[in-house]
Curated annotation (Swiss-Prot):
Gene3D superfamilies: 1.20.5.1300, Nitrogenase molybdenum iron protein domain. The active site is at E326, H327. This is Histidinol dehydrogenase. GO terms for cellular component: cytosol. It catalyses: L-histidinol + 2 NAD(+) + H2O = L-histidine + 2 NADH + 3 H(+). Homodimer. InterPro entries: Ald_DH/histidinol_DH, Histidinol_DH_CS, Histidinol_DH_monofunct, Hstdl_DH. GO terms for biological process: L-histidine biosynthetic process. The lineage of its organism: Bacteria, Pseudomonadati, Pseudomonadota, Gammaproteobacteria, Enterobacterales. NAD(+) binds at Y130, Q188, N211. SUPFAM superfamilies: ALDH-like. Keywords: Amino-acid biosynthesis, Histidine biosynthesis, Metal-binding, NAD, Oxidoreductase, Zinc.
């Protein structure tokens, strides 16, 4: 199905409607699973030697020193333009502002007289950031991960990226307070962060995107007692746009294409009650596509994408909630009026002047978002992902005495005698003191 094919949602059967919202399969092949398992074993048992061998094999790079030196980082920064450095600083300022505002106030309440309950927040002690390499270095992801890690107060923040690491990534890491940077990529980097090596420290939690091998490595280490926690499940990028008759077709097309150029497995969907707008957007997509350097990639993504015509905006919202997109762009008049009805989306962009690119880079929100329908249960990355909550309770003698019979009754009902005894012994001790 080509992207210029308009689909009337209400002419489709329920089965056809479900098929229209089905995402491409992303399950790892048995081959990838086995390869990753072998990599994890080798890195865990052989440490730095295995990391160097994998760099030579997969990255075609002979790595002597795994850790990037301060001199190398300074030299990388010197090679960048002032314009780019200023743009990074501006983005970081907005990211800091938004994520600092997410700081949770402590909870301190007396649930009944003499029973004090608190909730306090502590940072995850050590985190590892994985940043992919390639022709287009994702230095913006460094800003999105390292900034909240710093605000949260994580004691150790380390970064791994395939060698040779781009100057932009090195400078962004320094700008955001990353303490150590390592020339390690792929599944072997995830293994090093999860298990540690002679050079790479073991961390408590791993963040960052990657290819199928990196994704599978994160999955495997997250399920091991000796591994590490991960940020969230990963899948191909996606955007859904809701547009009305007042939308600008060129704007809508540019937003769809900015997602499609991410990769051939990206998915884009347009929902509109106006068939004329849908046709104009399709025409604008073709015009803009011809000028894109990554047109081939975008065209592959568009082959699995949809132009859907609905009866009204309310139906657009209902379909969007059913799909649960990573990015939701609402290019309608009075776009904010629809926000309260949105129940599942990673990040929402309102109006003509809020392109996805703003959130990807510099508005301040985080661009690490749940994909593949995980918006139904997962949130966009934020300060809380670099923190953990801990509860504290303190009962006075009077508070304990007032609550004792309740606890004893509940423990007895669950037939947990030791639980009941822990209370009864104290009750008897208080009676003896009286």
């Amino acid at each position: 199905m080509s992207f210029n094919t308009l689909i009337d949602w209400n002419s489709c059967s329920p089965e056809q409607q479900r098929a229209l919202l089905t995402r491409p399969a992303i399950s790892a092949s048995d081959s990838i699973t086995r390869t990753v398992s072998d990599i994890l074993y080798n890195v865990k048992t052989r440490g730095d030697d295995a990391l160097r061998e994998y760099s030579a094999k997969f990255d075609k790079t002979e790595v002597t020193a795994l850790r990037v030196t301060p001199e190398e980082i300074a030299a990388a920064g010197a090679r960048l333009s002032d314009e780019l450095k200023q743009a990074m600083a501006a983005a970081v300022k907005n990211i800091e502002t938004f994520h600092s505002a997410q700081t949770l106030p402590p909870v301190d309440v007396e649930t009944q007289p003499g029973v004090r309950c608190q909730q306090v927040t502590r940072p995850v002690a050590s985190v590892g950031l994985y940043i992919p390499g390639g022709s287009a270095p994702l230095f913006s992801t460094v800003l999105m991960l390292a900034t909240p890690a710093r605000i949260a107060g994580c004691q150790k923040v380390v970064l791994c990226s395939p060698p040779p690491i781009a100057d932009e990534i090195l400078y962004a890491a320094q700008l955001c307070g990353v303490q150590e940077i390592f020339n390690v990529g792929g599944a072997q980097a995830i293994a090093a962060l999860a298990f540690g090596s002679e050079s790479v420290p073991k961390v408590d939690k791993i963040f960052g995107p990657g290819n199928a091998f990196v994704t599978e490595a994160k999955r495997q280490v997250s399920q091991r007692l000796d591994g590490a926690a991960i940020d969230m499940p990963a899948g191909p990028s996606e955007v859904l746009v809701i547009a009305d008759s007042g939308a600008t077709p060129d704007f809508v097309a540019s937003d769809l294409l900015s997602q499609a150029e991410h990769g051939p497995d990206s998915q884009v969907i347009l929902l509109t009650p106006d068939a004329d707008i849908a046709r104009k957007v399709a025409e604008a997509v073709e015009r803009q596509l011809a000028e894109l350097p990554r047109a081939g990639t975008a065209r592959q993504a568009l082959s699995a994408s949809r132009l859907i015509v609905t009866k009204d905006l309310a139906q657009c919202v209902a379909i969007s909630n059913q799909y649960g997109p990573e990015h939701l762009i609402i290019q309608t008049r009075n776009a904010r009026d629809l926000v309260d009805a949105i129940t599942s989306a990673g990040s929402v962009f309102l109006g003509d002047w809020s392109p996805e690119s703003a959130g990807d880079y510099a508005s301040g929100t985080n661009h690490v978002l749940p994909t593949y329908g995980y918006t139904a249960t997962c949130s966009s990355l934020g300060l809380a992902d670099f923190q953990k909550r801990m509860t504290v309770q303190e009962l006075s003698k009077a508070g304990f005495s007032a609550l004792a019979s309740t606890i004893e009754t509940l423990a007895a009902a669950e037939r947990l005698t030791a639980h009941k005894n822990a209370v009864t012994l104290r009750v008897n001790a208080l009676k003896e003191q009286a």
